[in-house]
Amino acid sequence: MELDSLIQRATQYEEKTVAVAAAEDHEVIEAVASAIERNLAKFILFGDKEKILQIMEEHHGDLAKNPKLQIIHTHSPAASAEHAVKAVKLNEANVLMKGNVPTATILKAVLNKEYGLRAGSVLSHVAVFEVPGFDRFTILTDAAMNIAPDLEQKAQITRNAVGIAKSIGVDNPKVAPIAAVEVVNPAMQATLDAAALTAMNKRGQLAGCIVDGPLALDNAVSLTAAEHKGIKSDVAGQADILLVPTIEVGNALYKSLIYFAKAKVGAVIAGAKAPIVLTSRADSAESKLYSLALAICSASK
């Protein structure tokens, strides 16, 4: 599957509005220009208006005149984060996007008790990869938000990822809780949690998906590896969602896919009242565009 299909899917929905916090960033403006060109969304850009216009004039001279674009000046990154979050809270926008603002600053606004977007559940990072040679999306969670989630948090992280998967057409996603081995070992918490999540799925506590674990990474994604080890499972070798036990595992796998496998990626923060595009400054404009498309699909489900 190609991530370009997410852009096509997103354009089929009713047009959404994206609120961008601190939009004075070259890659952000590039992604916004590409999104508008593809009729992906409308945008409200919060930030230093003079800098935003300067970036537009350098690369996209007519962009500022586009009727699908609104620029609202704010005096600081923190203020832009607050205004962008409030725009989503007040239903003036459907998606929140991070621009040139620290992650901690925008998350502080998202979690604000007065005007924030907390929905009572765990916020988690969900990344959708297009891996060369694979015939399906690889969905990875959580590589950026939850450091060492417990069983209850892993269950909610799974639900968040399943919701994202369904929004992009994976109707009954197969979830592999990842561990170092395929058997339950009382000395390895990841295997205990994986077994519990599998049982929860069978009892209907984790609905709308198929969960089976623990599974090592090779057995989760490769039918050949699973067959060699004699693992019989509805998930082994066919996993849509890789649920990692810790942020270190997720972060290393995320970056390995990008830098070693040359995978493409789009990612969102799920679990809030609206999807959040929280890409890093190192991410390309293409990756930001895929993340926008993913967020729009999620907001439209």
Residues covered by each model-derived region:
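Anion-binding alpha/beta catalytic cores of soluble intermediary-metabolism enzymes, centered on
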Residues: 1-235, 240-244, 249-301
